[in-house]
């Protein structure tokens, strides 16, 4: 079986209220060369049933975990795609052609990492503002001295270079993960 270009990974835990918007944003994508993995931490609020009813979802795993980053590692291990996209419950792609634009960029430059900006929106998807920390024109390991300049939702990584999240970091394992990905990138 041929590998999909993207593995979209959504982490959930009792996310019945926020998951539907995330699912809709994936279902609306015009680019469909992806697998969509839901990794759930044994929700009790109907999250799993909601995920299972989405035609876009390839796989739903629901079992206890040790928190967000443990669940993200489970998604990493299960992913088959060439690139990883973490889009957690409550997150959404900006436009229906977001994956297409990323795929076009990948086709032109064959990068290890693709990154972008993050827009903050309200529950009705109305624009609030751009994220306070903006991504630089050219991202490097040194860029992270200024903080987490790129949200992990806007940080798409070639699966082969992606390490697992370090579970010693309870709150900022994504910051550490992005730096380690940058160190592995060509």
Language model segments and positions:
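A conserved acidic beta->alpha catalytic loop
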Residues: 32, 40-49, 88
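Short aromatic/hydrophobic "clamp" motif used to bind/position activated sugar donors
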Residues: 84
């Amino acid at each position: 079986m041929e590998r999909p270009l993207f593995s979209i990974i959504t982490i959930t835990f009792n996310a019945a209220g926020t998951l539907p918007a995330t699912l809709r944003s994936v279902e609306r994508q015009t680019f469909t060369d992806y697998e969509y993995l839901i990794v759930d931490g044994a929700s009790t609020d109907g999250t799993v049933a909601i995920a299972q009813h989405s035609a876009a979802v390839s796989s739903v795993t629901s079992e206890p975990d040790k928190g967000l980053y443990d669940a993200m590692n489970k998604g990493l291990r299960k992913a088959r795609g060439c690139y990883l996209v973490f889009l957690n419950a409550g997150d959404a792609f900006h436009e229906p052609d977001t994956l297409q634009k990323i795929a076009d960029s990948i086709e032109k430059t064959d990068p290890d990492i693709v990154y972008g900006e993050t827009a903050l929106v309200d529950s009705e998807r109305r624009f609030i503002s751009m994220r306070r920390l903006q991504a630089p024109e050219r991202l490097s390991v040194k860029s992270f001295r200024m903080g987490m300049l790129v949200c992990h939702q806007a940080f798409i990584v070639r699966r082969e270079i992606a390490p697992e999240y370090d579970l010693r970091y309870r709150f900022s394992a994504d910051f550490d993960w992005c730096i380690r990905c940058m160190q592995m990138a060509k």
